[in-house]
């Protein structure tokens, strides 16, 4: 039987002229035949979902250690929430929803066990060998470390998806090739030698909405988890005018609401107001820029998908509250110190005796290597661990493992 591609619904949405177009994609590093039933960006999104790295997000920390409770968010639940917000923004702005969703789904692949604590610890032990950067690690995963296909390593994503992964937070280089946030990680520079991701320009608007969706999701849901854990209280939220206004609005409409429902009503309003703010700002900036293609978005002198000045101030206030009340809470700091010790101990143990990694693939690849490449392989192995696996690996090798509860 044959497929009538003219009758298919995919790829027929009303995209804006400045949206990324899968039919004119800059292609993949390893050329492949197209699909008669899916656009290239759909295929990217599907490949991302089927990776081992995606499944591992289930047991990687967002803020609270993955063993803390069934209802706290992990990297996977956070990623799904980011993808939902990114897709909503993409639809409102007439962008390619599949590309926006794909960038959102892949953006946290490079995160280590134990969240930013694990990343900081791994960066510290890898400093003599080039350090560690989760964004560069995400690129390594999708271009090298995932091994599923017969003809290439990685998952061979399109240029647009990789560009979005690497540049979703903005250009990495100035026009004069100076790093915008310090030196560009070597894995990114190495890949650009093969497939230039144009590090001095902005990413597509699809990637930009994925980035702002990440901010919206983690601010909102860290508040939710903070209230659930007891590290935050409603009185603390009242200190931020934006949140105080939302709470007053909910109380006026539902004066006797139970706390769990009250929390949800605040969170849903926070997400809605932030999404609407981004849409309004993007529409205003698009009307001024008047882009005629996705290339005009990349060449713009500022980000298009952003918060207004007032909402950006609210975003900063929320981040400051979360940092003070949760991230720097003594209980969380104790847990973070223990998590860092686990990563540091495992790195030292595997460098001293790679056979302790209990993986034939990694042991075979490390045998006979000098310290620098060996350290990178050990770093890859550690970065891929889930929280629970890292804890169990430490218990197997050491008499005392820090209590992360």
Curated annotation (Swiss-Prot):
Keywords: Hydrolase. PROSITE patterns: HD. Pfam families: HD, HD_assoc. It comes from the Bacteria. GO terms for biological process: dGTP catabolic process. SMART domains: HDc. InterPro entries: dGTPase, dGTPase-like, dNTPase_2, HD/PDEase_dom, HD_domain, PHydrolase_assoc_dom. The keyword Signal does not apply. GO terms for molecular function: dGTPase activity. Residues 75-219 form the HD domain. Belongs to the dGTPase family. Type 2 subfamily. This is Deoxyguanosinetriphosphate triphosphohydrolase-like protein.
């Amino acid at each position: 039987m044959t497929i009538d591609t003219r009758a298919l619904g995919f790829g027929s949405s009303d995209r804006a002229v400045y949206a990324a177009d899968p039919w004119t994609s800059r292609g993949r590093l390893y050329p492949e035949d197209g699909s008669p039933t899916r656009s290239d960006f759909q295929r990217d999104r599907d490949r991302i979902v089927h990776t081992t790295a995606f499944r591992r997000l289930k047991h990687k920390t967002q803020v609270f250690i993955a063993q803390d409770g069934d209802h706290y968010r992990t990297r996977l639940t956070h990623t799904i929430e980011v993808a939902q917000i990114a897709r909503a923004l993409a639809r409102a702005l007439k962008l390619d929803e599949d590309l926006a969703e794909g960038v959102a789904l892949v953006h946290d692949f490079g995160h280590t066990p134990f969240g930013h604590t694990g990343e900081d610890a791994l960066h510290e032990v890898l400093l003599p060998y080039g350090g560690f950067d989760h964004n560069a690690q995400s690129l390594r995963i999708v271009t090298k470390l995932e091994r599923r296909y017969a003809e290439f390593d990685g998952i061979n994503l399109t240029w647009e998806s990789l560009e979005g992964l690497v540049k979703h937070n903005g250009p990495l280089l100035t026009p004069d090739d100076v790093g915008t946030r310090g030196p560009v990680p070597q894995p990114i520079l190495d890949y650009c030698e093969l497939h230039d991701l144009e590090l001095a320009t902005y990413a597509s608007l699809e990637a930009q909405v994925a980035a702002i969706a990440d901010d919206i999701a983690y601010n909102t849901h860290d508040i939710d988890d903070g209230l659930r854990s007891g590290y935050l209280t409603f009185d603390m939220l009242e200190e931020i005018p934006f949140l105080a206004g939302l709470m007053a609005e909910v109380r006026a409409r539902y004066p006797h609401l139970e706390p769990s429902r009250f929390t949800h009503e605040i969170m849903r309003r926070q997400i809605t107001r932030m999404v609407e703010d981004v849409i309004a700002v993007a529409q205003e900036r698009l009307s001024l820029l008047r882009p005629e293609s996705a290339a005009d978005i990349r060449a713009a002198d500022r980000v298009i998908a952003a918060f207004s000045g007032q909402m950006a101030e609210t975003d900063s206030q929320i981040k400051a509250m979360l940092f003070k009340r949760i991230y720097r809470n003594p209980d969380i700091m104790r847990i973070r110190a223990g998590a860092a010790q686990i990563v540091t101990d495992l790195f030292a143990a595997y460098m001293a005796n790679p056979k302790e990694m209990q993986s034939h693939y990694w042991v075979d690849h490390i045998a006979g290597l000098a310290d620098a490449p060996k350290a990178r392989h050990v770093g890859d192995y550690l970065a891929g661990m889930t929280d629970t696996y890292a804890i169990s690996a430490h218990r197997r090798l050491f008499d005392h493992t820090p209590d992360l509860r």
